[in-house]
Amino acid sequence: KGRLWVLLSGERGQYEIALCNETIKKIQLDGFNCNEKEMDGWRYNRLDAMAKFANEGLMIPEQVWDKPDLRSPDKQFVPDLKFGEGTGSATPLAWSMAQFIRLATNIKAGKNLDTPQVVYDRYVSGNR
């Protein structure tokens, strides 16, 4: 069974950046004012959540234990499982670490930097 994947919080954060940017444009087009600073708060919540799952060495695990604590009968090969901590899976997981950096960079830029303009134009703007 799979457990909580931290990197998916980062991917959700990127989705929310894209959604927020389109929502702001629509609100402004409809004549409403939108406070982008308020909308920034939840973007940082995703980044903070990812950081809280990091271990003592600030490495983000592949999966996090999401059940009550479970003591291991064989500590040599299987770690104790503690709620909110890594499951003993890959740590650091390069994908999780990269997603954290991508989300932080995209938050700072205010947009998803890895979305090619041609893709944005076709699927968001409707320009072909």
What is the role of each PLM region?
Residues 1-99, 107-128:
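Non-catalytic carbohydrate-binding regions of carbohydrate-active enzymes
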